[in-house]
Amino acid sequence: GHFFTSINYVNNDGIVRGDKDVYKRLSAQINADYKLYDWITVGTNTSIENYNTKSVSQHGRYGNLMNAVMTIDPLTPVYYSDPSQFANTMKQAYDEGKNILKDPTNGLYYATSKYIDDDNGNPLLQRDKTDSYNRGINLRGTLYANITPFKGFTFTSRFGYRVAQSNSHSYSVPYYANKQTYSDEYSISASANNSWYYQWENFANYN
């Protein structure tokens, strides 16, 4: 018989600084066949993968990170260290007790433009206001048997299958950047998906 196996690992940190857009995947492939007798051969082709992804906002009601990168004005700093530096609307929101987010790595406020009010705001704010991830397992393969009871005739029975399971979670906190970029609510969502597919084929060839 013959046996082949391979293992592959991918760890892609994405284009956004930090760990908010990552893709990790561990996958394996097994191909094998064995001649049980002169007239029957069995085999399998099987692959399995386990993946884990985290992503940043690409679209949505409150802007997205990539638009924020392209539209924020060049005069706005990345951070404000003190509320006295805030734009007027941001100062008002701060005085009203709105949640002005800080970067958890340095304790500084995300800066917001004093010249432009749009629904995108600071790219780092778009990056950090939501935590979301998706993880799952995929299993797919084929089992087969080739039966040759006499010369020139082959009967094949083949069973193909695919099984998938995934879970996704997302969590957002209240925040304020400007009159268009804000949320007063916590948001939590979760979903689970399971699917399976199979196909059984039987056919014969005679040459």
Role assignments for model-derived ranges:
Residues Y37, T148-F150:
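Residue-level recognition of beta-strand termini and adjacent short loop/turns
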Residues Y9-D13:
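Transmembrane beta-strand segments that form the barrel wall of outer-membrane beta-barrel proteins
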Residues G1, I15-D21, Q29-R140, T156-N207:
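Surface-exposed loop/interface segments of Gram-negative outer-membrane beta-barrel transport/assembly proteins
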Residues F153:
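An active-site-proximal structural segment forming one wall of the substrate-binding cleft
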